[in-house]
Amino acid sequence: MGNIRQTFIKRVARELFDRYPDQFTKDFEHNKKKVGELTNVTSKTIRNRIAGYITRLVRMKEEGKML
């Protein structure tokens, strides 16, 4: 079974991915730094979850599974 992410995390991740698609890669550590720069999220846990979901979105886009 997979993890179900909160709507807040999905919304913020999709907004960032739509605004800055060229700044994110398949590397989680890189995405984590970019999320920290582009948002005002102070919680490390929330930042990591957003970065993880963005990493997943990048992979889905490269595989052609994203709408």
UniProtKB/Swiss-Prot annotation:
One of its GO terms (cellular component) is ribonucleoprotein complex. One of its GO terms (molecular function) is structural constituent of ribosome. Belongs to the eukaryotic ribosomal protein eS17 family. The gene is rps17e. HAMAP family: Ribosomal_eS17. GO terms for biological process: translation. This is Small ribosomal subunit protein eS17. It holds the Pfam family Ribosomal_S17e. The keyword Ribosomal protein applies. It comes from Thermococcus onnurineus (strain NA1). NCBIfam families: PRK01151.1. Keywords: Ribonucleoprotein, Ribosomal protein.
